[in-house]
Regions:
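C-terminal motif of bacterial Sec signal peptides marking the signal peptidase cleavage site
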Residues: 21-22
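C-terminal/domain-edge helix-coil "capping" segments
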Residues: 139-170
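Bacterial lipoprotein signal-peptidase II cleavage site
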Residues: 25-30
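N-terminal secretory signal peptides and thylakoid transit peptides that target proteins
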Residues: 1-18
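Sec/Tat-exported extracytoplasmic proteins
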Residues: 56, 60, 84, 111, ...
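Surface-exposed short loop/turn segments
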Residues: 77-124, 130-143
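N-terminal segment of the mature soluble domain
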Residues: 34-84
Length: 170
């Protein structure tokens, strides 16, 4: 009897495995870019700019032009126009104390090629997360807030990379 149990389990899972393989499902691959070099016009200490630099360098197929005097060597120029973190009160208790916040990261950018032609026009991207607040756990909530901001920033960087990968003509 124990030898039949694994065989039954195998017979039950085999059709699901074949169905999943046949539907065309595959894991997301690293992006492939149509350009070889890019200049990032971002503020020097911008956390989003630093993460974007790391992500592009990790791709291995793109070289970063870091010297502003060498901008004309870059195939594309990424301009970060605005990076804004917001914290908005969502709810209050009956005594007027804050109960819930909404955290937002607002980002505006555009991408142009070496000739100055815009390849991605002025684009605004917004990420938002809700967070509850309690005076008794203020330090923990501050750490949670930092974590949420980092997660939103990472998500925005992934979205930017997907948009850059979608460019087929530079």
């Amino acid at each position: 009897m124990p030898a039949r149990l694994p065989r039954r389990a195998l017979l039950r899972t085999a059709p699901l495995t074949l169905l999943l393989a046949g539907c065309g499902f595959e894991l997301r691959k690293p992006p492939s870019f149509a350009f070889q070099s890019i200049y990032l016009a971002v503020p020097p200490m911008s956390p989003l700019g630093l993460e974007l630099q790391r992500a592009l360098a990790a791709s291995g197929s793109v070289s970063l032009v870091t010297d502003p005097r060498q901008v004309e060597r870059a195939d594309l120029v990424f301009e970060l126009l605005q990076e804004l973190r917001e914290k908005v009160v969502l709810g209050r208790t009956s005594t007027g104390a804050v109960r819930e916040y909404q955290l937002r990261v607002r980002l505006r950018f555009k991408v142009r090629n070496r000739q100055g032609i815009e390849r991605i026009p002025d684009t605004e991207m917004v990420q938002q997360r809700d967070i509850s607040y309690s005076e008794s756990s203020a330090l923990a909530k501050e750490a949670e807030e930092d974590l949420l901001y980092r997660n939103m920033q990472s998500d925005l960087v992934r979205q930017i990379l997907r948009r850059l990968a979608a460019l087929r003509e530079i």
